[in-house]
């Protein structure tokens, strides 16, 4: 979440003219941006900060999880982790049987053995063609580990290997 105060506008190089074009969004809403009739943006509530986006444009669907993830941690008590799971499942269930061409979702090694729970739940619900893991803290080996641990599950989504910051991908969706 970024507040559009003078300090942050200056920090991020946002002019007053540009700020007038920014629309602040809320969870669980549908947005139809001005001057277009072929893009629809739906938001989901994050389990941390902000929202996740489901964007439909010209027959294609892109999902960006943001911080919507199954944030289960070793240092938290069972009640916290169970509550987090319930909140996450409530949101991610909105993607049941949704065809998603391109998805971006957290795969966070800080969660230790639970690092892949969020993507597992996402993949069990949505029909995803390509999935880009994110939030992996410059530890791209976690992507290969995730894929190897799930070799027997015959995932229908192609999990994209990311090897370095700034890497360029060409994907035909």
Residue ranges and their predicted role:
Residues 2-7, 29-31, 49-51, 70-74, ...:
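Active-site environment of divalent metal-dependent phosphoester hydrolases
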Residues 1-2, 63-67, 83, 102-109, ...:
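Active-site neighborhood of phospho(di)ester-bond hydrolases with catalytic His/Asp-centered motifs
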Residues 11-12, 44-47, 67-68, 104-109, ...:
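Noncatalytic linker/hinge segments flanking ATPase motor cores
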Residues 1-4, 9, 41, 122, ...:
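Generic low-polarity alpha-helical segments
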Residues 87-93, 112-121:
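A short, acidic, amphipathic alpha-helical segment used as a generic capping/interface helix at domain edges
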Residues 13, 17-33, 115-173:
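Binuclear metal-ion centers of metallo-dependent hydrolases, dominated by the metallo-beta-lactamase
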Residues 1-12, 93-104:
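Active-site metal-binding motif and surrounding structural segment of the metallo-beta-lactamase
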Residues 21-99, 166-173:
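Core dinuclear metal-dependent hydrolase active-site scaffold
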